[in-house]
Amino acid sequence: MPNIFSLICICLHSALHSSGFFFAKLPEAYAVFNPIVDVMPVIPLFFFLLAFVWQAAASFR
């Protein structure tokens, strides 16, 4: 159990300190796409929520 906890701590520590990866700047040629790139990580969550809505709608039939 302590090994799993230490592994989680190491992963969180590395994820928090590599924030330069998450906030990298796009090259000037692609600066127009900044708003789209900011929203892109949220798109899979919409599909995840859609699955629950679909199941709820199907169960009410």
Swiss-Prot record:
<feature type="transmembrane region" description="Helical">
    <location>
        <begin position="36"/>
        <end position="56"/>
    </location>
</feature>
<comment type="similarity">
    <text>Belongs to the PsbK family.</text>
</comment>
<keyword id="KW-0934">Plastid</keyword>
<protein>
    <recommendedName>
        <fullName>Photosystem II reaction center protein K</fullName>
    </recommendedName>
</protein>
<keyword id="KW-1133">Transmembrane helix</keyword>
<dbReference type="GO" id="GO:0015979">
    <property type="term" value="P:photosynthesis"/>
</dbReference>
<keyword id="KW-0150">Chloroplast</keyword>
<keyword id="KW-0793">Thylakoid</keyword>
<keyword id="KW-0604">Photosystem II</keyword>
<dbReference type="Pfam" id="PF02533">
    <property type="entry name" value="PsbK"/>
</dbReference>
<dbReference type="InterPro" id="IPR003687">
    <property type="entry name" value="PSII_PsbK"/>
</dbReference>
<comment type="subunit">
    <text>PSII is composed of 1 copy each of membrane proteins PsbA, PsbB, PsbC, PsbD, PsbE, PsbF, PsbH, PsbI, PsbJ, PsbK, PsbL, PsbM, PsbT, PsbX, PsbY, PsbZ, Psb30/Ycf12, at least 3 peripheral proteins of the oxygen-evolving complex and a large number of cofactors. It forms dimeric complexes.</text>
</comment>
<feature type="propeptide">
    <location>
        <begin position="1"/>
        <end position="24"/>
    </location>
</feature>
<dbReference type="GO" id="GO:0009535">
    <property type="term" value="C:chloroplast thylakoid membrane"/>
</dbReference>
<keyword id="KW-0472">Membrane</keyword>
<comment type="function">
    <text>One of the components of the core complex of photosystem II (PSII). PSII is a light-driven water:plastoquinone oxidoreductase that uses light energy to abstract electrons from H(2)O, generating O(2) and a proton gradient subsequently used for ATP formation. It consists of a core antenna complex that captures photons, and an electron transfer chain that converts photonic excitation into a charge separation.</text>
</comment>
<dbReference type="InterPro" id="IPR037270">
    <property type="entry name" value="PSII_PsbK_sf"/>
</dbReference>
<keyword id="KW-0812">Transmembrane</keyword>
<keyword id="KW-0674">Reaction center</keyword>
<keyword id="KW-0602">Photosynthesis</keyword>
<dbReference type="GO" id="GO:0009539">
    <property type="term" value="C:photosystem II reaction center"/>
</dbReference>
